[in-house]
Amino acid sequence: MPSLKPPASSLELQASSLAFEVQAREGEARAGVITTRRGQIETPVFMPVGTAGTVKGIRFEELEAADLDARIILGNTYHLWLRPGIDVIKACGGLHKFIGWERAMLTDSGGFQVWSLTEIRKITEEGTEFRSHIDGALCFLSPEISMEVQTALGSEIAMAFDECPPGQIDHDAARRSMELTLRWAQRSKEAHVALQAGMLRPSLGEGWGEGLRRAKASPLPPLPGGEGEKRQALFGIIQGASHLDLRRESLVRTVEIGFDGYAIGGLSVGEEKPVMLEIIEDI
């Protein structure tokens, strides 16, 4: 695969627009505030899911009203990429302008949705090949492409591309999946750093699903129409299925790669509820 690794001096994540402050603790519980370029979010927080850019059955005015006061919603990278397509969203100035939402957004990487397409996908070292659930077209999603899509969407928080294994797989299979996720995490970070620094520009509309596109060799200026001086934040994802030793190892090694924040992935994917709660408590 083509290397997207920028010079060593620029590999580390530059200052993002994200800050987190813990304001109170009680036992393992914490209350805090996340500061983004689009306002503050008190935690813990409920994040409504806007799969295709809208939260079903409720208007944004209601989400923003005092009784709900939703400060962040989630956009689904996989679904937005396939329909309406990134070219359409880019032409509107990014996802916020496309949907008319002025508060913070988090976009997932597409990994979970691809996992759900068990019968029509193929996972390789390069990424995931799958059939669109819309028209059956052959598509290809990789760490690099996921980062390009999320950069173009312009969310405040992007997620690294990961493999989401079933919750009840055996230890050997879970380790193979975890190792792949860790390699993809490194590639996600390298691509994200390059994109945010303007070293790569999303080549939107140039053969999505036809394989990995080549990195641009010449430096590029920062992308126009950005969301401020500070860049999009990138979160790493902890995997390891239901095996606590793998979860702990995944946590340590993902932190070593270095992200702005960390998510616990691969929960509620077939494991028993007590196992899920044990993983959350342990991590």
Residue ranges and their predicted role:
Residues 46, 118, 134, 212-218, ...:
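Residue-level recognition of conserved structural "scaffold" positions that shape functional pockets
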Residues 69, 146, 202, 218-219, ...:
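Generic detector of short, well-ordered, non-transmembrane alpha-helical segments enriched
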Residues 2, 16-198:
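Non-catalytic, usually N-terminal nucleic-acid engagement modules in DNA/RNA processing proteins
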Residues 2, 195, 233-235, 239-283:
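Glycine-rich phosphate/ribose-binding loops and adjacent secondary-structure elements
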Residues 154, 227, 258:
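Conserved functional loop/turn residues at catalytic and ligand-binding sites
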Residues 40, 51, 76, 86, ...:
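Gly/Ser/Thr-rich helix-start
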Residues 1-15, 194-231:
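Intrinsic disorder/low-complexity segments
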